[in-house]
Amino acid sequence: MSLRIRLARGGAKKRPFYRIVVADSRSPRDGRFIEKLGTFDPMLPRDHERRVVLKDERVKYWLGVGALPSDRVARFLGLSGLTEARKVPEQTKQAQPKAKAQERLREAEEKARAAAEAAASAEG
């Protein structure tokens, strides 16, 4: 049985509320789960203390047994200090600005440099 620590959605329409649960990876998202480990309320502000609530000892136990956290839960665990924060991959070549955009950026930098040099020479 492959275990996952993941979010199970609750709450009303347009008012999400999530339970952080340990469940078999084959069970439905909001279906049967083994244990409730905490809650996540995305409607609260990011810095609110009740936005993510976790049972630390139980999370450590399930991680020790081999349960894998989902991406979102792994982020919560990293922020709470229970696991190492996942590393964000560097920008890929495909995500970088295209050639024309890079050329425009270079031209803008050169103009800014020239203006700064002109201002410096005018003062001195």
UniProtKB/Swiss-Prot annotation:
Which residue ranges have biased composition labelled Basic and acidic residues? 100-114
The alphabetized UniProt keywords are:
Ribonucleoprotein, Ribosomal protein
What highest taxon heads this organism's lineage? Bacteria
The UniProt GO MF terms for this protein read:
structural constituent of ribosome
Q: Name one GO biological process term.
A: translation
Its cellular-component GO annotations read:
cytoplasm; small ribosomal subunit
Annotated region described as Disordered, given as residue ranges: 88-124
Gene3D superfamilies assigned: 3.30.1320.10
Q: Where is the composition biased (Low complexity)?
A: 115-124
The family annotation for this protein states: Belongs to the bacterial ribosomal protein bS16 family.
Q: What is this protein called?
A: Small ribosomal subunit protein bS16
Q: Source gene?
A: rpsP
